[in-house]
């Protein structure tokens, strides 16, 4: 007589249940890692934007005629207009426009929470994953929201003077 060896239905169900539990736990941990990565990416984009902006403004102060890959005219005599031109070069260059979305010189930076949008935009409000730039007098106001909900602890506000 041949004896066949096989798993019983109960043993198979136990294995499937264990795999399901492990998968559920893994998804929870994985989503935490992705949120953390989005926060880090947003902070990195903000930091790079601020450094780049300050460096390009300094080029103008040192006598350059243009900056920001030629999209910023350094010769604007009105300080408020110069600040506006800096914001426009960062966020709204007509030749870089795609569909209804405005892009600036840092067009390769995408919003970590919505890759269909640029990370750097001309806005006055906090929007998750976005570096929002607006002009106040001769200053650039840079608002960044790192997490969904944009609670005070998850936002940043930086002013960059275009005249100092």
Residue locations for each model-derived region?
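Low-complexity, intrinsically disordered short peptide segments enriched in small/polar/basic residues
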Residues: 7, 11, 24, 42, ...
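Membrane-proximal N-terminal amphipathic helix
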Residues: 35-65
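Intrinsic disorder/low-complexity segments enriched in polar/small residues
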Residues: 3-6, 49, 131
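General helical secondary-structure elements
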Residues: 1, 34, 39, 47-50, ...
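N-terminal single-pass transmembrane signal-anchor helix
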Residues: 2-34
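Alpha-helical protein-protein interaction elements
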Residues: 14, 21-25, 44, 74, ...
């Amino acid at each position: 007589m041949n004896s066949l060896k096989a798993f019983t239905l109960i043993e198979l169900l136990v294995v499937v249940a264990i795999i399901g539990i492990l998968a559920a736990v893994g998804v929870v941990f994985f989503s935490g890692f992705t949120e953390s990565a989005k926060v880090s990416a947003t902070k990195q984009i903000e930091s790079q934007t601020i450094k780049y902006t300050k460096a390009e403004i300094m080029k103008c102060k040192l006598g350059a005629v243009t900056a920001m890959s030629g999209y910023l005219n350094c010769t604007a005599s009105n300080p408020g207009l110069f600040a506006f031109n800096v914001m426009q070069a960062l966020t709204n260059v007509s030749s870089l426009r795609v569909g209804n979305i405005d892009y600036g010189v840092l067009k390769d930076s995408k919003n970590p929470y919505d890759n269909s949008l640029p990370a750097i935009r001309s806005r006055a409000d906090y929007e998750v994953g976005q570096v929002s730039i607006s002009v106040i007098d001769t200053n650039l106001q840079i608002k960044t929201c790192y997490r969904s909900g944009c609670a005070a602890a998850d936002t940043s506000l930086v002013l960059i003077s275009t005249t100092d």
